[in-house]
Amino acid sequence: MDTIVDFKALPYRKCVGILVFNYEGKVWVGRRLMTVSHANVDMSKLWQLPQGGINQGEKPIDAARRELYEETGIQSVKLIKEAQDWFEYDFPQELMGHVLNNKYRGQTQKWFSFQFTGEISEITINPPPDGNKAEFDQWKWVDLEELPSIVVSFKKHVYTQVVKEFRNSFKYL
């Protein structure tokens, strides 16, 4: 017998999201590797910023640096800003059962922005460093304002908030 899950009763997973600005003020984005859950998604909407879960007892800033390295190989960064608030999104119904073992209804994210101070050769996504699982198959630098138009629809409102929050970050570098 199938168990019916009330997804609205599930908690949000605590995560971090990371913006990395280059010296021109552009932001690093990666294109998600295709999975079964992406089967009906427009390929032009598979771009996203690095993000990931916060481990038990881990500080959000430490999770941000760890996730950035695990997903991109980037370590040469300088912190610019931490978002004041947490931003959250719900997983769409069609992804339920495909993400995080149905333990969460969505994610609540603390966002950070960093200045990239390294060399392009530091960026390694497929495979990423230390045997981590690849999450991206391509990457590029884009204008911050472009972000909401290149992500999946259920994250668009969060990316709009992120753009507003970090819009002036590059001016203070």
UniProtKB/Swiss-Prot annotation:
Any one GO molecular-function label of the UniProt entry: guanosine-3',5'-bis(diphosphate) 3'-diphosphatase activity
Required cofactor names: a divalent metal cation
Short sequence motif Nudix box: positions: 52-73
Pfam families, sorted: NUDIX (PF00293)
Domain Nudix hydrolase span(s) in chain numbering: 11-164
Coiled coil (residue ranges): none
Keyword Hydrolase included in the entry's annotation: yes
Record InterPro entries: Nudix_hydrolase, NUDIX_hydrolase-like_dom_sf, NUDIX_hydrolase_CS, NUDIX_hydrolase_dom, RppH
EC numbers on record: 3.6.1.-
Alphabetized UniProt keyword annotations: Hydrolase
Domain of life: Bacteria
Role played: Accelerates the degradation of transcripts by removing pyrophosphate from the 5'-end of triphosphorylated RNA, leading to a more labile monophosphorylated state that can stimulate subsequent ribonuclease cleavage.
Family: Belongs to the Nudix hydrolase family. RppH subfamily.
Protein name per its UniProtKB record: RNA pyrophosphohydrolase
Highest classification ranks of the organism: Bacteria, Pseudomonadati, Pseudomonadota, Alphaproteobacteria, Hyphomicrobiales
